[in-house]
């Protein structure tokens, strides 16, 4: 039987390129992850007759993931944008053009229990940026990039989304670990 615990905060978010079913590139850390929210997108319908609802249809058809981080990280932006990233000793430059293809990625997040004894990991194995990539630069405020992704079904191995609750503090990896621990 599952233990009921409370989870607080966001300890880690990672992103990796999606190379195929259950195949991912190297996991990259979203530095200063501030928010990761996941919403199920549900298709619904109902049959009505005799002044009542006779049947209800509901099916999860995708997931929406919103991410916000504390740093402007061009490497992370390059992974999701399909742009061209070049760097030298003086600068990093990410160029996005009309012919760039937005890539599928995998995203995973980690929250710790309020007593520090276990972890909750959330894994969206295949998603693509689906909303605006937001930057707000203004006087007296930090810039916090934010993006919205749409997750699709990857297949039988990982589905659309996984929630894995570990019985001990556990390092976040893509794909998700199957054992507890930080090493």
Language-model segments: residues:
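Membrane-insertive, pore-forming/entry segments and their flanking low-complexity regions
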Residues: 1, 6, 11-14, 171-183
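Solvent-exposed edge beta-strands and adjacent loop segments
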Residues: 2-80, 127-144
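Ordered hydrophobic segments in well-structured contexts
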Residues: 4-17, 103-108, 120-125, 160-162
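Acidic Ser/Thr/Pro-rich low-complexity disordered segments
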Residues: 21-25, 108-117, 163-169
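Surface-exposed ligand/attachment interfaces on beta-rich extracellular proteins
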Residues: 47-51, 87-95, 179-183
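Structured, beta-strand-rich domain cores
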Residues: 64-119
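Mixed-charge, glycine-accented linear interaction segment located at domain edges/termini
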Residues: 123-183
